[in-house]
């Protein structure tokens, strides 16, 4: 699945939209080529601001998710099936920051694709692969949290490392196979040959997607989304009931120490809440883009390019959101960051450091 200008052609709207940001005169991507795409560059001020905003997002996505992966893979205390899913999700977001955002940044600001026709298609495949991989990871994480909250005592025997590994493998393989096969078989632009031919120019990266595949893409987004909403609704109800039960028991045994089950339940509820926020952030970031894709496909690409650019970069910025959410809610992640940044992670036996408060 392509996003951004990959699936929306540069046309007069893109030229007009840049006037909103004080665009200079219209130029060509490649001045010496007859088939060059037209570009309408931003004036220096807005150009610098856009590079700063987009570049900051890429750096945040790379560094933040690298910290998440390093924390989970290095510290033995974090070696759990659920955390391996989180690390794999961070890997998808990390790859967005490395392999997608820098190239999209240049394309968005300069109005041209300077990285070759082959990488244009790869870039679009990477976008789709990482998008669906993140979505499937979040779906499996929601199921994991449901099991943990609904039955915390038997949870370790139900969601094992083997189950986690299968979820990770499924998330990556299905996403990659679907995205690459869609674009490399040409199924995405079947019936749009005339449009593709008319839009093709040197310095452009237009990946057209017909109505059928736009609808299928939307279904692939919608079905896991409905699963996550349903599961987290159940988690909310269970957590509410558990909180009421704990409150009743605390009144009856005010001086009694907290049971192991109660401690586990509280910990799992907090994890479910944090990951639920991550899911909500993902859906809020992606839903406007998918809705706009449906509208464009069936109404003839009516969205102005600058609006499309905004939607796409909201999607990209989602890849930088999860580490910020973890840092805000998880004390163990904040402690892990301090150890990594200070270099204490290089000390002998640092992997056995206790990251959880007593």
UniProtKB/Swiss-Prot annotation:
<feature type="glycosylation site" description="N-linked (GlcNAc...) asparagine">
    <location>
        <position position="210"/>
    </location>
</feature>
<feature type="transmembrane region" description="Helical; Name=2">
    <location>
        <begin position="84"/>
        <end position="104"/>
    </location>
</feature>
<feature type="glycosylation site" description="N-linked (GlcNAc...) asparagine">
    <location>
        <position position="34"/>
    </location>
</feature>
<feature type="transmembrane region" description="Helical; Name=5">
    <location>
        <begin position="213"/>
        <end position="233"/>
    </location>
</feature>
<dbReference type="InterPro" id="IPR050569">
    <property type="entry name" value="TAAR"/>
</dbReference>
<keyword id="KW-0472">Membrane</keyword>
<keyword id="KW-0297">G-protein coupled receptor</keyword>
<feature type="topological domain" description="Extracellular">
    <location>
        <begin position="1"/>
        <end position="47"/>
    </location>
</feature>
<keyword id="KW-0807">Transducer</keyword>
<dbReference type="InterPro" id="IPR009132">
    <property type="entry name" value="TAAR_fam"/>
</dbReference>
<feature type="topological domain" description="Cytoplasmic">
    <location>
        <begin position="334"/>
        <end position="358"/>
    </location>
</feature>
<keyword id="KW-1003">Cell membrane</keyword>
<keyword id="KW-1133">Transmembrane helix</keyword>
<comment type="function">
    <text>Olfactory receptor specific for trace amines, such as beta-phenylethylamine (beta-PEA). Trace amine compounds are enriched in animal body fluids and act on trace amine-associated receptors (TAARs) to elicit both intraspecific and interspecific innate behaviors. Ligand-binding causes a conformation change that triggers signaling via G(s)-class of G alpha proteins (GNAL or GNAS).</text>
</comment>
<keyword id="KW-0325">Glycoprotein</keyword>
<feature type="topological domain" description="Cytoplasmic">
    <location>
        <begin position="144"/>
        <end position="166"/>
    </location>
</feature>
<feature type="transmembrane region" description="Helical; Name=1">
    <location>
        <begin position="48"/>
        <end position="68"/>
    </location>
</feature>
<comment type="similarity">
    <text>Belongs to the G-protein coupled receptor 1 family.</text>
</comment>
<feature type="disulfide bond">
    <location>
        <begin position="37"/>
        <end position="201"/>
    </location>
</feature>
<dbReference type="GO" id="GO:0001594">
    <property type="term" value="F:trace-amine receptor activity"/>
</dbReference>
<feature type="disulfide bond">
    <location>
        <begin position="120"/>
        <end position="205"/>
    </location>
</feature>
<dbReference type="GO" id="GO:0007189">
    <property type="term" value="P:adenylate cyclase-activating G protein-coupled receptor signaling pathway"/>
</dbReference>
<feature type="transmembrane region" description="Helical; Name=3">
    <location>
        <begin position="122"/>
        <end position="143"/>
    </location>
</feature>
<feature type="topological domain" description="Cytoplasmic">
    <location>
        <begin position="234"/>
        <end position="274"/>
    </location>
</feature>
<keyword id="KW-0675">Receptor</keyword>
<keyword id="KW-1015">Disulfide bond</keyword>
<feature type="topological domain" description="Extracellular">
    <location>
        <begin position="188"/>
        <end position="212"/>
    </location>
</feature>
<dbReference type="InterPro" id="IPR000276">
    <property type="entry name" value="GPCR_Rhodpsn"/>
</dbReference>
<feature type="transmembrane region" description="Helical; Name=7">
    <location>
        <begin position="310"/>
        <end position="333"/>
    </location>
</feature>
<dbReference type="GO" id="GO:0005886">
    <property type="term" value="C:plasma membrane"/>
</dbReference>
<dbReference type="InterPro" id="IPR017452">
    <property type="entry name" value="GPCR_Rhodpsn_7TM"/>
</dbReference>
<feature type="topological domain" description="Cytoplasmic">
    <location>
        <begin position="69"/>
        <end position="83"/>
    </location>
</feature>
<feature type="topological domain" description="Extracellular">
    <location>
        <begin position="105"/>
        <end position="121"/>
    </location>
</feature>
<feature type="transmembrane region" description="Helical; Name=4">
    <location>
        <begin position="167"/>
        <end position="187"/>
    </location>
</feature>
<keyword id="KW-0812">Transmembrane</keyword>
<feature type="topological domain" description="Extracellular">
    <location>
        <begin position="296"/>
        <end position="309"/>
    </location>
</feature>
<dbReference type="Pfam" id="PF00001">
    <property type="entry name" value="7tm_1"/>
</dbReference>
<feature type="transmembrane region" description="Helical; Name=6">
    <location>
        <begin position="275"/>
        <end position="295"/>
    </location>
</feature>
<protein>
    <recommendedName>
        <fullName>Trace amine-associated receptor 7d</fullName>
    </recommendedName>
</protein>
